[in-house]
């Protein structure tokens, strides 16, 4: 019997069960635990496209028509990295959704072909062999300040944003809010032609229930409570009362100056109800110095924003100027300067690293253009994982590879924000039935620059060479929009997430959008326990004088990183 070495097999078909893959230039390795497309037990029938290869007529390609169930697209031999596992498989896509994960081919001549992966004349092939596939990232904290961020998001592997804003207005530069039905309608129309799913946040800073209900009918998918609009206990309670009735999520940026109360008063106003706490560490805003303690509460869904990820020797220096600009502060006013300095604490930023590694902070977003970078959500997440691997070693259950850590960290920008915002019925993971929002990565560039971004079954963004060249690969190879980013295609492959009340009130008939409006799921029963692999609730204490952080009684010492992977090895600037 002919034998192939593992090295030769990987070169031909991609790695298989038991092989390990390094993620970019980090210290992180993932190990394939199962190969549904080939490998041990299935070797010899791998679905591979190309000259002289398998997926040809009456060989790997069958006669099955689209009407008889052939998929529109098959991604062959991809390594799937998701919260539920790390496996290799062929992925079937039909009508813009994932329809099968298993083995593709022609059952007339092959064994083990998945019924949903029967390749036919109507099937397109994307080669995933040797590549990693993740679910499209969800940026759960986006300021809509300029439309150019949408391209940057796609270029970083993001396919969904939870966002607020109307452009470069002062309210939008500081707060993630699209206030009122008129602005919500215009922004839903403006965003209709981009190949990203959109969930807009209305203004929750009011004690007027009707002011919030009209925003839900106008297209808001949830609310933002921001200190710059006055996050008082009364506003918190009023907002959550409407959220409970509507089933939507509230996102909170608490009172840095402790003017209307301290963290204890905010928690009392929340009354144990589900709430998403933005930039839980506090440099992005929130009760000084101990907002980070909310990460230990079972009803609070905590997230970070990426400028503090991970803690490095440069983190503190860049934050002061960022904060002054974002919150319309005047450096010549001593009170404004004191306000800014109170938010930037190395001890809590350092503790944020550990809280991510133990799964106590569940999500990572960008805070785009408002102290964060939308194109770096994925990259900063894996840099944090690398720093924690170097400092803490393997997580429990890991020995030769970092599967437990990899699954925990990928969940922070995929399934966890999807669950938190009621989007998980449509997106957030590589699972059958969900939108085919998928990102393909070359392992050497994992988390840095995608090979291709598939949005709703179409390639919307990809690394592409000179368009006037004779082949697709000549330099300069740059991230570029593809046909899936064309306006009509983008609308057909993406959705606007809105509150159920908007659909019931006929919003689709009142606004000029071509994409489907999808109701968010009810999240009022979602707590930390529902955050996959990120459900820890440690006891967190912050000394009010020294800002020393204790996590389950232990002091976490500051050791800012001096060098990071996924950095200047990949970028000129």
Curated annotation (Swiss-Prot):
GO terms for molecular function: nickel cation binding; urease activity. It is an enzyme of class 3 (hydrolase). One of its GO terms (cellular component) is cytoplasm. InterPro entries: Amidohydro-rel, Metal-dep_hydrolase_composite, Metal_Hydrolase, Urease_alpha_N_dom, Urease_alpha_subunit, Urease_AS, Urease_asu, Urease_asu_c. Its cofactor is Ni cation. Binds 2 nickel ions per subunit. NCBIfam families: PRK13206.1 (NF009685), PRK13207.1 (NF009686), urease_alph (TIGR01792). This is Urease subunit alpha. It comes from Mycolicibacterium vanbaalenii (strain DSM 7251 / JCM 13017 / BCRC 16820 / KCTC 9966 / NRRL B-24157 / PYR-1) (Mycobacterium vanbaalenii). The gene is ureC.
């Amino acid at each position: 019997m002919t034998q192939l070495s593992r090295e030769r097999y990987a070169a031909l078909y991609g790695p298989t069960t038991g092989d390990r893959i390094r993620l970019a230039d980090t210290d992180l390795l993932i190990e394939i635990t199962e190969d549904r497309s080939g490998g041990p037990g299935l070797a010899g029938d791998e679905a591979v496209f190309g000259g002289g290869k398998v997926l040809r007529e009456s060989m790997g390609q069958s006669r099955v028509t689209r009407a008889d169930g052939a998929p529109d697209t098959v991604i062959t031999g991809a390594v799937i990295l998701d919260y539920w596992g790390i496996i290799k498989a062929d992925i079937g896509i039909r009508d813009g959704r994932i329809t099968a994960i298993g083995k593709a081919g022609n059952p007339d001549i092959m064994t083990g072909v998945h019924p949903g992966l029967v390749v036919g004349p109507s099937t397109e092939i994307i080669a995933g062999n040797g590549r990693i596939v993740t679910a499209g990232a969800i940026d759960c904290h986006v300021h809509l300040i300029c439309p150019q961020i949408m391209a940057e998001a796609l270029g970083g592997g993001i396919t969904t944003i939870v966002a607020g804003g109307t452009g470069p207005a002062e309210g939008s530069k500081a707060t993630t809010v699209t206030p009122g039905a008129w602005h919500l309608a215009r922004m839903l129309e403006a965003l209709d032609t981009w190949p990203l799913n959109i969930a807009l946040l209305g203004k929750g800073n009011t004690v007027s229930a009707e002011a919030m209900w009209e925003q839900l009918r106008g297209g808001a998918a949830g609310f933002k409570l921001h200190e710059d609009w006055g996050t008082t206990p009364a506003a918190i309670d009023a907002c959550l009362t409407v959220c409970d009735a509507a089933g939507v999520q509230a996102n909170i940026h608490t009172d840095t100056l402790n003017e209307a109360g301290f963290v204890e008063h905010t928690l009392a106003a929340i009354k144990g109800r589900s709430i998403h706490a933005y930039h839980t560490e506090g440099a992005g805003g929130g009760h000084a110095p101990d907002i980070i303690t909310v990460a230990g509460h079972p009803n609070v869904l905590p997230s970070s924003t990426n400028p503090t990820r991970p803690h490095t020797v440069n983190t503190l220096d860049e934050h002061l100027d960022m904060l002054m600009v974002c919150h319309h502060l005047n450096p010549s006013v001593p009170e404004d300067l004191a306000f800014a300095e109170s938010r930037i604490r190395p001890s809590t930023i350092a503790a944020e690293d550990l809280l991510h590694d133990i799964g106590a902070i569940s999500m990572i977003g960008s805070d785009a253009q408002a102290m964060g970078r939308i194109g770096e959500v994925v990259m900063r997440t894996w840099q944090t994982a690398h720093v924690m691997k170097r400092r803490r070693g393997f997580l429990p259950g890991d020995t030769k590879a970092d599967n437990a850590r990899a699954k925990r960290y990928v969940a922070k920008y995929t399934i966890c924000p999807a669950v938190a915002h009621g989007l998980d019925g449509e997106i957030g993971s590589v699972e059958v039935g969900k939108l085919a929002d998928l990102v393909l990565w070359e392992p050497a560039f994992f988390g840095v620059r995608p090979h291709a971004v598939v949005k709703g079954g179409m390639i919307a963004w990809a690394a592409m060479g000179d368009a006037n060249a004779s082949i697709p690969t000549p330099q300069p190879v740059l991230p570029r929009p593809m046909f899936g980013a064309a306006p009509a295609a983008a609308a057909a492959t993406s959705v606007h997430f809105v509150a159920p009340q908007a659909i019931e009130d006929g919003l689709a008939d009142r606004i000029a959008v071509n994409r489907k409006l999808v109701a968010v799921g009810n999240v009022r029963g979602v707590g930390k326990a529902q955050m996959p692999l990120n459900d820890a609730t440690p006891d967190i204490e912050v000394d009010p004088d020294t800002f020393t952080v204790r996590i389950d009684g232990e002091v976490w010492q500051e050791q800012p990183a001096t060098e990071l992977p996924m950095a200047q090895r990949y970028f000129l600037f």
